[in-house]
Design a protein with these regions (language model features):
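Non-catalytic structural scaffold of enzyme domains
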Residues: 28-298
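Compositionally biased, low-complexity flexible segments
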Residues: 9-10
């Protein structure tokens, strides 16, 4: 059973009737599974960009978030290592009875998606297809830049997705930006060092006359104000958070998994290191209290 869902939910999700039979109650009604949480995971704080979009689009849904803050960044690690970490986190979330998994990490989506889907009996959403579709919808010239971690860039996952969806005429220019993730994790969202790094990374891309830039790591939207200043008003910045939230809503509706409860949603955050730093950055970004942060050890 292959449970990976692309941005359209077409062609990549086999066995949907089997899954529907397992998660619907007898007679087609909604089972208690509908009140189960959505599991969202990333290498660190960056996946909160997706959490925020899901909270806004699906305000009744319970969410469990896992940020692997002890082992961030993932983008400079080998595919085998990333796959091993992804398997650990997937099993952690499945043990907590999530009804949907959202891979809010471009590196894991690029190099470990098969590992995740092989383990999961619930639908799996990922960010790369959604980000590619969002960029193509925004671009007028089909000249699209991609910034991401070294692992994501090396995988060519975005280039493949853009050309599969938009055709071979799509022009792409890509740049690995390994320092952005640690800068975001440090909370240096408007620090002089971050400005210098951004100008160094983005200068060669701007010379390619792009009209759209994919923020190909879920950490990068936290730098959106700074990056917008660096690239200027003629370049549209695109990420996948909103598109993933929309697709999550569609999947829950399709399988009768929308939470019917009128109770306030429960948000739980699990991290592997520095919970106080995670709290500081996370509350600033989400604009709401983060009352339940738990430290986990693997």
């Amino acid at each position: 059973l292959h449970k990976h869902l692309d941005g359209r939910g077409e062609g990549r999700f086999k066995g949907s009737a089997f899954v529907r039979d397992r998660i619907r109650g007898k007679g087609g009604g909604v089972s208690s599974t509908a009140t189960h949480p959505i599991g969202i995971f990333d290498s660190g704080v960056g996946g909160l960009t997706v959490v925020r979009a899901v909270m806004e689009r699906l305000p009744r849904e319970n969410i469990i978030y896992f940020g692997d803050t002890a082992r961030v960044p993932y983008g400079v690690k080998s595919p085998d290592t990333v796959a091993r970490y992804a398997a650990q986190i997937t099993n952690f979330l499945l043990a907590r009875s999530v009804k949907l998994l959202v891979v809010a990490c471009n590196t894991m989506a690029a190099v470990a998606l098969d590992t995740i889907t092989a383990l999961s009996p619930v639908p799996v959403l990922e960010v790369i297809d959604a980000g590619a579709r969002s960029a193509l919808a925004a671009s007028k010239t089909k000249r699209i830049g991609i910034i991401a971690t070294p692992s994501t860039i090396a995988s060519q996952a975005y280039v493949v997705a853009l050309r599969r969806i938009g055709g071979p005429e799509v022009f792409t220019a890509a740049r690995a930006c390994p320092l952005f993730v640690p800068l975001v994790e440090e909370g240096w969202l408007d620090h002089p060092a971050t400005w210098l790094v951004a100008e160094e990374y983005l200068g060669p891309l701007l010379a390619e006359h792009l009209d759209t830039l994919i923020l190909g790591c879920t950490h990068y939207p936290l730098l959106r104000p700074l990056l917008g200043e660096v690239v200027g008003p003629d370049v549209r910045l695109q990420d996948s958070a909103t598109a993933v939230a929309e697709r999550a809503a569609a999947i829950l509706a399709e399988f009768g998994l929308e939470n019917p409860s009128a109770d306030p949603p429960r948000y739980t955050y699990h991290v592997t290191d520095m919970p106080h730093r995670f709290l500081e950055i996370g509350q600033r970004f989400l604009g709401r209290p983060m009352d339940d942060i738990r430290l986990e050890r693997f």
